[in-house]
């Protein structure tokens, strides 16, 4: 028997208490904001059999918080995704009305950096590149602010906020070749919030869709090797240049798509990730 909790916040607090009452060994996975907020991490590190971080930056943050004598309990295991049935080819399609289709599947919150993609789209149009559509799939407190920004830049013809859609519908868009590019212009916001390794990127990469994102949070660990295009945060010009290159260079597009798919298949396959986690359970079972 073993208790494992996801998130270093309330779920792991419940697991910590349950373990103390039942005497069943326990462990937890820490993601991102739950590390920054601490959440009794020193005490949890003392009693947990192991702690799983999902990326190098998260692991480093955990190590800086907990006592040195507990750092041996830290392990990095990515969040996996199901890579079955990824039968899309790597050709871009200019899917609807001969337009290149860009989407950002993310909550409308500061750390997702939507405003910088809006500004990048404005730059593309200034360069005469108008054969694209950009859709934001998500909801959040910035909805009205982003609508105002889109209108201020006269981009209603090019950018639409579609709201949240069911996850399976998003995956069907990928599978049915309705999307050419994912752009996630993430930032470290004024509160210090940042990305881990976003599933919005890994899922798209698994379908052979190129991704553009920024050098924040755990993102460099995913695409810093050329498996996607990485730019500096808050840099609309770099975003625009990256989008333009993918739109105009089909061979480059295919190369990025293939590298991205291989990266996810090799390192983020849910079966591989599950086995790594099971191995930790087995190791700790033998020592108890």
Short names for language-model regions:
Residues 158, 238, 245, 252-267, ...:
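A short, well-ordered alpha-helix in the C-terminal region of glycosyltransferases
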Residues 201, 206, 210-213:
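Short hydrophobic beta-strand element within catalytic cores of glycosyltransferases
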Residues 194-201, 219:
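Short glycine/serine-rich donor-binding loops of glycosyltransferases
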Residues 222-236, 245-251, 266:
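Conserved acidic donor-binding segment of nucleotide-sugar-dependent glycosyltransferases
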């Amino acid at each position: 028997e073993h208790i494992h909790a996801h998130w270093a916040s309330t779920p792991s607090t419940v697991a910590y208490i349950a373990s103390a009452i039942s005497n069943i060994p326990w462990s937890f996975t820490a993601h991102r904001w739950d590390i920054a907020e601490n959440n009794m991490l020193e005490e949890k590190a003392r009693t947990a059999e192991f702690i799983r971080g999902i990326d190098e930056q998260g692991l480093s943050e955990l190590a800086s918080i907990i006592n040195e004598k507990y750092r041996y309990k830290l392990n990095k295991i990515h969040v996996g995704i199901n890579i079955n049935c990824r039968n899309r080819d790597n050709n871009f399609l200019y899917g609807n009305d001969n337009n290149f289709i860009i989407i950002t599947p993310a909550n409308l919150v500061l750390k997702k950096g939507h405003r910088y993609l809006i500004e990048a789209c404005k730059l593309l149009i200034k360069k005469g590149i108008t054969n694209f559509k950009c859709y934001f799939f998500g909801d959040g407190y910035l909805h009205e602010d982003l609508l105002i920004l889109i209108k201020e830049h006269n981009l209603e013809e090019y950018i639409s906020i579609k709201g949240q859609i069911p996850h399976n519908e998003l995956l069907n868009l990928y599978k049915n070749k309705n999307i050419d590019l994912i752009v996630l212009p993430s930032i470290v916001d004024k509160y210090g919030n940042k990305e881990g390794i976003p599933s919005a990127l890994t899922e798209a990469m698994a379908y052979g869709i190129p991704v553009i994102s920024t050098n924040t949070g755990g993102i460099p660990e995913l695409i810093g090797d050329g498996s996607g295009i990485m730019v500096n945060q808050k840099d609309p010009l770099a975003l625009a240049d990256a989008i333009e290159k993918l739109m105009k260079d089909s061979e480059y597009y295919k190369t990025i798509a293939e590298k991205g798919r291989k990266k996810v298949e090799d390192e983020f396959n849910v079966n591989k990730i599950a086995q790594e986690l099971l191995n930790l359970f087995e190791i700790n079972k033998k020592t108890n």
